[in-house]
Amino acid sequence: FRDEVNHPSQSADKYYQTKGGYESLIVGCYSNLKNIYNTTTYQIFTQQGTDVFTQNYPTEVAAMNQYTTTYQSNNGTIYAMWSSYFNALNNVNAAIDRSKSVILKTDDPDGIEPSALTQLVAEAKALRAWYLFEIVRNWGQGPLKINESKEPSYTVEYSNGAAFYQQIFTDLEEAIRVLPWRQTGSNYGRMSKAAAKHIRALAYLTRGYEEYADPKDFENAFKDAEDVYLNSGHKLLDDYAMVHRQSNEINDEIIFPIGFADGANYNTNIWNQWYMMPYAIGGWLGLGKDSYYGNASMHVEAIPTKFAYMMYDWQKDRRPSVTFMSPLNGNASTSTDGKDAGKNWFQCTTPVDGVFAKGDKIIYFPVPTDPEYKYWAETDKNGVRYKVFNYPMGDDTNWANDDYYKHAYQTTNSTSRTCLPIWKFKDGNAEYREDESGSGTRDIYLFRLAETCLIAAEAAVMNNNDQANAEKYINYVVSRAEKHSPQGGLSRYSNVTIDNILDERAKELLGEGSRWNDLQRTGKLAERVLKYNWDVSNIYGGTIKTTLTQESFERKFKLRPIPLQWLNSLSNGHE
């Protein structure tokens, strides 16, 4: 993307009529993606309160994770996300509205080519469709903004979900007619036909569950997803590890990334801090703040549930070794970040005389692909200087005796947990920063083809239980997962169910996509959260009760509440 240029002597209206000005306006529309998806707020909003992620600090009552009585319309996370989506929406509306005044090359030699302008507007419409979709799937209604707001508005009118989807599909149809299947070269990272069709497939799929659905929604979702798979030129990579290898981040599977790069203002990705054990504040002798592990935010907001660890078969499935700290990630030639820090143990970064030398083992996580993997009894643990945290075993719904979920187990930090970190987002270029600001350079994958396959599989199940296509597309993903695994033999699906789809989405996309929306869309949130998220059903040992039930999900939790802070800013906010 091009750098934006400030022209203080020129009005914004005049500047955005020029070729360079309008191009910078579109660049700004893409920059808004970082303001939404590169935030810990987004992590809380999309991962907490699910079957595969829970809170790191068990001594806190977390409304977004535990669905307590404190989950109300004044929730700051919900307001922040609402504001981010509408701010981004206003910028794309500005780009679309102002396109009518852009000077064309047919009228001025310095103007923009009409075909180039048409494509930029199509990109903006695809982005607008995505933001509108995010709003409607999370809140179900709201002000349907399709024009730029240049001044504050203190009165609004709500539009229902059906109206939102009508606009979404109109924008996507117009974008799909114009955009190329893929964006390459200097245009890589821009909206494409494949990205727009992926969005439309997901939008059809999501609307298909609603009371106002069109009878052909699931059929249309499948058609769009299959079209992307067959005709876009995107391919599932042979090796899951190569999907997440930082040195291979531009690859055939990625449909739409959010771009980061070296250099000031571009190296701001914070995903490498997510799901990372807060090692530097955990009271660990010999583990200090160091760029070897980079930032591990003291505000880690989500850690995997026991179910998230135990759903994988490490011997038959390549994905867990890529996803978590593991021997694979401890080898610079195979690791996701090209370094050796991802081995399944933390090493000493701050030597302690007579106790730990630099590089000594401090915390050890036995994992099933480790040649020395075993269950460590307390007597075994007492025989070594370092601390050992056993991999979860037994009932995946009961965490009471698992090392990962004990409060301050073997550490002086009385609030945090110590569990095997997710490593697939780690960044070989990130550095340690005291202010915890982002320093990562790797892209965020917003859409990739494996998810498109799982959209196709889910749509097939919901479209008159089309098992032939459901099995085909879910097993494309499973077949790739088996490749390069230690043993192979990963079972394929037959008679696919929605729970199978949710399981496979969790394994393939852990931490990448919005898990909360997957459970919300399918109506499985209460069932799976109450079963697999111990922190929801055992708040303070059961002394505080969650308000989540299937009935309360349908009545209250299926949609996010309209933020009270926003309503209070309106003159008609309480009508």
Task: Specify the residue positions occupied by each region the protein language model found.
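Conserved, well-structured interaction surfaces
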Residues: 17-19, 23, 27, 31-37, ...
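An aromatic- and glycine-enriched ligand-binding surface/loop that stacks and positions planar moieties
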Residues: 2-60, 194-197, 202-391
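C-terminal substrate/ligand-recognition segments
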Residues: 75, 79, 334-335, 339-477
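Short coil/turn linking the two alpha-helices of tandem helical-hairpin repeats
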Residues: 134-143, 206-215, 464-465
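Long, intrinsically disordered, low-complexity segments
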Residues: 1, 54, 72, 85-88, ...
